[in-house]
Amino acid sequence: MSRIGKRPIPIPAKVSVAIDGRLVSVKGPKGELSRELPSGVVVTQEDGNIIVSRADESRLARQRHGLSRTLVANLVEGVDSGFQKRLEIIGVGYRAQVQGTTLILNVGYSNPVQIEPPEGIQFVVENNTNVVVSGISKEVVGNTAARIRAVRPPEPYKGKGIRYAGEVVLRKAGKTGKK
């Protein structure tokens, strides 16, 4: 049995869960999320916990068991406390700012790069070089952070670019000159 899938998901006090077949809707202090789970899994609510189990023992159901449990757990955590991803901008003259809701990145291109946030996502810029992407959906927060990083990924020679906080960038030695 899936070790992740068999763990129950505790429901926090301020969160309400509605299960309608394969559709799971979660409402909490930060907002509301819903997701349709893949076939082959059954979701039930028992005394303050959500339990994800398999409909049968097929290979597909076994594959989707742990995935479905994690997806539901992310819904519950998102509406209760939310998610955030931090990015660092490294490079001389590289900086970020927020204008209204739009993130504006000056990262060495001739024009600044403007990034509009998807619905439910907020950008916060700390001291011009740190960007915090926050929201209630882990998937959307991660995808938005990846889009920002893709504007100028860290390069291996000087390490300039946009990276996740704590990301280790492998550095390369430059060419050695001929003597």
From Swiss-Prot:
Keyword field contains ATP-binding: no
Keyword annotations of the record: Ribonucleoprotein, Ribosomal protein, RNA-binding, rRNA-binding
Example of a GO biological process term: cytoplasmic translation
Gene Ontology CC annotations of this record: cytosolic large ribosomal subunit
Molecular functions (GO terms): rRNA binding; structural constituent of ribosome
Coiled-coil intervals, chain numbering: none
Domain of life of the source: Bacteria
Pfam family, one: Ribosomal_L6
Family membership: Belongs to the universal ribosomal protein uL6 family.
Assembly: Part of the 50S ribosomal subunit.
Function comment: This protein binds to the 23S rRNA, and is important in its secondary structure. It is located near the subunit interface in the base of the L7/L12 stalk, and near the tRNA binding site of the peptidyltransferase center.
Protein name: Large ribosomal subunit protein uL6
Organism: Synechococcus elongatus (strain ATCC 33912 / PCC 7942 / FACHB-805) (Anacystis nidulans R2)
